[in-house]
């Protein structure tokens, strides 16, 4: 049974299938009766909750407050910002009626044709329109600014090709929407929140990211600038892991949100929006996990330490229980989440396989000999290394080990990412290297036409125009690898999810 539990497709054989197997077998999520909508199972949701809690703290530390806005948006609202509606029109789910009735033939329920809405409602694909319609009532003077609101919600965008966590029709996310008196303040906010996302990804998820600005072609619909964090998965593909948008005055003008400034003149408000979603779960899984299952960073693991007893009889189990009780209390006192699994309905081998599959960072085992010697076997999930350690001060040992694991999996991901960054000067070399995966730094002439040609030829897109330190040496001007026209700096290309 333990072997069946971990019978995952190997990454080297089929990376995509390995990912799908892992999400299901590790009890993170599964498909639902509704196409494109997933069920996030308790263990998967526990990881998301830890992400949510940490991000929420970081938002509040930067002065943001939470609010909630309606799920349904009048269709006319989406017509007010032309670029915005064009960007989302094909993905919108539309509510046309407000009532069902029993079918006359008794076959069930049907839509009541008499209950047609005067104006159709859109299930939110994102909330800029409904929020800016609301902000109009909240803002009259510069004294009402800034507004720094965040919303935790679900959104819906019809997706035809779905993958659990990475691309689903309904997904959970947070969306921040801020209003400012000046352009400078709004631009600073957009960058500040990108940096919050970058810190969260690297410090808590242990996922190294490249920060930069999107090309005009990849920009959020209705934004003047879109900033992004891009992560690299183990197959060399990029995953956009968070975006922050400088919206200028587009939405303020669309919804006529003006304020009296300090000079007593009417002016349109400046705006940002920013968001991350359950897609981060996909990034977490694909960055660290291996052929044995999940590898979770301790900072986000629902269970950081699991303790499993191995015993010959009930009397020995009682003695182990008594010993472990004190160890559990000491670990909890240090803020470590610990589970003692002394259930007798599964064998130790099954438990080992299950917790390995679920990525629990540290496993402690106590058997009869350990009881006599005042020791425990410690296994770390990231390297699968085992060590026998004295029970005296084991809580401090484990605390340090968790920090070491967090640092190690970040370093491993960073080393891999850096080993897969290539600089090229010619299009022929680009086409060759893109087949190997990874990030490619190359010159581009800044035109949408060249960007589209590269995408059509190679399936690679511009992930961002980077402002990260590791590409500082590539900030020099050059010539576009495709057209030979002038290029201000190298940009990051990759195939992506």
UniProtKB/Swiss-Prot annotation:
Top-level taxonomic group: Bacteria
Record-listed E.C. numbers: 6.1.1.15
GO BP, sorted A to Z: prolyl-tRNA aminoacylation
Pfam families: HGTP_anticodon (PF03129), ProRS-C_1 (PF09180), tRNA-synt_2b (PF00587)
GO molecular function: ATP binding; proline-tRNA ligase activity
GO cellular component: aminoacyl-tRNA synthetase multienzyme complex; cytoplasm
Coiled-coil zones: none
Record field: catalytic activity: tRNA(Pro) + L-proline + ATP = L-prolyl-tRNA(Pro) + AMP + diphosphate
Enzyme class: ligase
PROSITE patterns to which the protein is assigned, alphabetical: AA_TRNA_LIGASE_II (PS50862)
Subcellular location per the Swiss-Prot or TrEMBL entry: Cytoplasm
Keywords per UniProt: Aminoacyl-tRNA synthetase, ATP-binding, Cytoplasm, Ligase, Nucleotide-binding, Protein biosynthesis
Protein family per UniProt: Belongs to the class-II aminoacyl-tRNA synthetase family. ProS type 3 subfamily.
Function: Catalyzes the attachment of proline to tRNA(Pro) in a two-step reaction: proline is first activated by ATP to form Pro-AMP and then transferred to the acceptor end of tRNA(Pro).
Notes concerning its domains: Consists of three domains: the N-terminal catalytic domain, the anticodon-binding domain and the C-terminal extension.
Assembly, per entry: Homodimer.
Name by which UniProt lists this protein: Proline--tRNA ligase
Organism the protein comes from: Bacteroides thetaiotaomicron (strain ATCC 29148 / DSM 2079 / JCM 5827 / CCUG 10774 / NCTC 10582 / VPI-5482 / E50)
